[in-house]
Amino acid sequence: MTKKAFLTLACLLFAAIGARAEDTPTAGRLDPRMRYLAYNPDQVVRLSTAVGATLVVTFGANETVTAVAVSNSKDLAALPRGNYLFFKASKVLPPQPVVVLTASDAGMRRYVFSISSKTLPHLDKEQADLYYSVQFAYPADDAAARQKAAQEKAVADRIRAEAQYQQRAEGLLEQPATTVGAEDKNWHYVAQGDRSLLPLEVFDDGFTTVFHFPGNVRIPSIYTINPDGKEAVANYSVKGSYVEISSVSRGWRLRDGHTVLCIWNTAYDPVGRRPETGTVRPDVKRVLKEVRG
C-alpha cells in the first residue's frame, strides 16, 4: 500500500469515527425539522441548517446562555436570549465547531456543536437535514429531581408520622388510665353543695377515681372524706381535662376558696371490687347461685 493510499484511508477512517462520535438530534414525529436529544457533556451535537434560515437551540429552562464561541462569526450569526440560542448562516458553511456555555443555580454547563449550512431550494419538511429547532432534554436531571422529590416526600412523611404519633401520645396522656368501657365503671355519684364546682362526670373502676372537668374551668382542690368525717388532701394527676386519683372513697370534697362541693359515692365498696365482675380481678366474675332446699 502506497503512502498516499494509507493517508487517504486514515482520513476516511478518522472521518467515519468523527461522524459516529457526533450526536444527531432525533427528528420529531410530526415534523422532522423539530429535533430533540438528551444532553451528554461528552458528545458533539450535529446541527444542520439552510442558508438564510433561522435555527433555535433550546437549553434547560433554568439555564442562561452566558458565552458563545463560533469559528466564523462573519458568516454565522449567533444570538443568545435567556435559555435560547439563535443561529443564522449567511452562506454555505462546512462543519465547524461552536462552543456554548450556560449558567444555572446548579452551575455551568458546556455544549459543543458541529454546525453546517447549505443552500436549499425550499424549506419544507421534506428537505433532509433541515433543522428549525433543537431542544435538549435532561434525563439525569429529571432522575435526580425525582429522587430528591422522593427523599423530600419521605422526610415529610416521616415528620408527619412522628407528629401524628406525638399527637396520639399526647392524647393518651390527656386521657384517664381507666380504659374500661362505660358499662365497666361505677357512675353512682351524687353531688351536694355549690354546683359551680360540679364536674362533667365522675366515675371509678373500683380502684381509680376520675373527675372530668370542663376544659375552660379551674380545677379545684380535691380532698377525700375519711370515715371519721375529716378530710385529707387527695394526691391526683391531671391529664388534660381529667383528674385521676389512684383510690376510691366514700366521699370527696372539692374546694375553691370558700366554695365547697361534696361528691358522694353511693356504690362505694371498701374492698375495691371491679364494677363489671364484682371481684378484685377482671378475669374472675362473681356468680350468685340459687340454693335449692
UniProtKB/Swiss-Prot annotation:
Signal peptide: 1-21
Bilayer-spanning residue ranges: none
Membrane topology: Peripheral membrane protein
Any Pfam family: CagX
Biological process, per Gene Ontology: protein secretion by the type IV secretion system
Family, per entry: Belongs to the TrbG/VirB9 family.
Name of this protein: Protein virB9
Species of provenance: Agrobacterium fabrum (strain C58 / ATCC 33970)
